[in-house]
Design a protein with these regions (language model features):
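Oxyanion-binding "anion nests"
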Residues: 146-186
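Short acidic catalytic loops
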Residues: 20-28, 54-57
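Glycine/threonine-rich flexible loop motifs
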Residues: 27-39
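A short helix->loop->beta-strand "cap" motif at the edges of active sites that frequently abuts
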Residues: 48-52
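Conserved anion/nucleotide-ligand pocket segment
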Residues: 74-147
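Glycine-rich oxoanion-binding loops at beta->alpha junctions
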Residues: 1-17, 30
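Glycine-rich, charge-decorated loop segments at or immediately adjacent to ligand/cofactor-binding or catalytic sites
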Residues: 54-74
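Conserved functional hotspot residues or short segments at active or partner-binding sites
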Residues: 169-217
């Protein structure tokens, strides 16, 4: 059962061949992350097919007490308007959408034991297992809600390096001056240092925003 946008039209027919659909995917607490919308499509498909949908809930790595950032425009892969940092677990999102969108699915959320809304990931005792290739560390998840804004610009957000979303740059950016300026702003919990990198991306990949690919940033 493919959970990516080009395949969503076929989800109800595919779901009709199943007895139950179990969703067990780690989220990162950000509206940018596509798997929560995949869950929404799958939830609706199960409702249309008349089969149960079960979510094995997991902690929100960013915690559940802070909600911040603008709402994403619900279009394309972003099916619902969520703030950049939404403060919810996938089980909570599924429960909300099942009601607000009127899916009416036979939804069961297997709740976690021991997790509290104010609990940072480090306090869960869980190991970080990368939920997708560009989400390799907890630090990546922490900066992702803000750093992903650079993905919509003509700069590199670090994809194609070993530290995606932990670096940003372009050939026309003075790394030393940028780091000095940002450090001078005294942003709590953030330290910036100059870095130079080459984002290695297939030259044939779509590049509608004119990002610097395979060149020094």
């Amino acid at each position: 059962l493919a959970l990516t946008l080009p395949h969503v039209a076929h989800m109800p027919a595919l779901a009709a061949k199943l007895d139950v659909l179990l969703f067990d995917i780690q989220g990162v607490g950000s509206a940018w992350y596509p798997f929560q919308y995949s869950m929404s499509w799958a939830l609706e498909a199960c409702a249309l097919a008349g089969i149960p949908f079960i979510v094995l809930d997991r902690p929100n790595p960013l915690g559940g007490r802070v909600v911040e950032g603008p709402l994403l425009d619900p279009r394309g892969i972003f099916r619902h308007a969520l703030p950049l940092r939404h403060g919810m677990t996938y089980g909570e999102l599924a429960t909300m959408w099942n009601q607000t969108e009127g899916y009416g699915a036979d939804l069961t959320v297997i709740r976690m034991q021991g997790w509290r809304r104010g609990m940072p990931w480090d306090d869960t005792g869980l190991l970080w297992v990368m939920p997708s290739p560009n989400m390799g560390t907890l630090e990546t998840a922490l900066v992702y809600p803000g750093q992903c804004l650079f993905e919509r610009m003509n700069v590199s957000e670090g994809r194609g390096t070993t530290k995606p979303f932990l670096m940003v740059g372009a050939p026309w950016v003075d790394a030393e001056k940028a780091a000095a300026d940002l450090n001078g702003r005294g942003i709590p919990g953030a330290v910036f240092r100059p870095a130079h990198f080459i984002p290695r991306i297939d030259a044939g990949s779509p590049n509608p925003r004119g990002k610097p690919l395979n060149q020094m940033c």
